[in-house]
Amino acid sequence: MQVLKTPESAFIKITDFPYPPRFTEITDTVSGEIRMAHYQCGPKDGHTVLLIHGEPTWAYLYRKMMPVLADAGFNVIAPDLIGFGRSDKPVRKEDYSYARHVIWLKDWFSQATKGPVTLFCQDWGGLLGLRLVADMPERFSGVMVSNTGLPTGDHVPSDAFIKWRRFSQDVAVFPTSTIIQNATTTVLDEATLAAYDAPFPDESFKAGARMFPILVPTSPDNAEAQANRQAWEKLKQYNKPFVTAFGDSDPVTKGGEKVFQKLVPGCNGMAHTQIENGGHFIQEDQGERLANLLVQFIQNTQLK
């Protein structure tokens, strides 16, 4: 499998993400070894908080949340998914599948984290992170979800999603930072936009970003739709603290929190929040507020 590595020089102008990358060699039965990056801050002996990004971002998305969590005494870990950030980027679209992303993330998680973990996830961070919670519930002491879901293909996708999926495949130049800007309520400055473009020096680096939209299960007979149904059966038994914090300005996932609140027993009695002026990339719009909510959630439910 041919893999690209974004040169470190691509990241040199980023001044607001001071965390050095740490690399983990992970394997699967098809690709052999592949390298996944993550970033750490806060006391390493603190309670671990795992922050998983989605499409088409990288751990830089969490730069507003990480210092707040670290100052609260948590061991903060934010990975770059394969195909994103400083992680390796397989060249062929065929090298990416939902199942393989789960395998990659699970291998990395088993190596890079220890003890009980609180998960925060958004977008594809939920499609992947919640599969880990379902498969390894003993490793997770709590979960906060924002602007995400775990689709089973049993509902017709929206016209907006169908257009987005088609766009992701047909557009000649995949406009990473423009996609992010169009899904926030705040205006991002040039340095921030450049930081989101940094992992992708040219189109050959973007196979993973182009693939995520078509890996979302949109029909009931999709293999990963069945895997997600099985994951939901396990989440229906998850009775540890589970809270939702969705944005009020994200048309993609609006109302999705109700599914979690209805089906996951750990949601009962939790202080669920709708975040004002929170677009799809809510970490950009309301990062500090989200981080403070996450601190309160952990302190009130998991560290008593």
Tell what function each PLM region has.
Residues 64-68:
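Typically the conserved alpha-helix immediately C-terminal to a functionally engaged Cys/Sec
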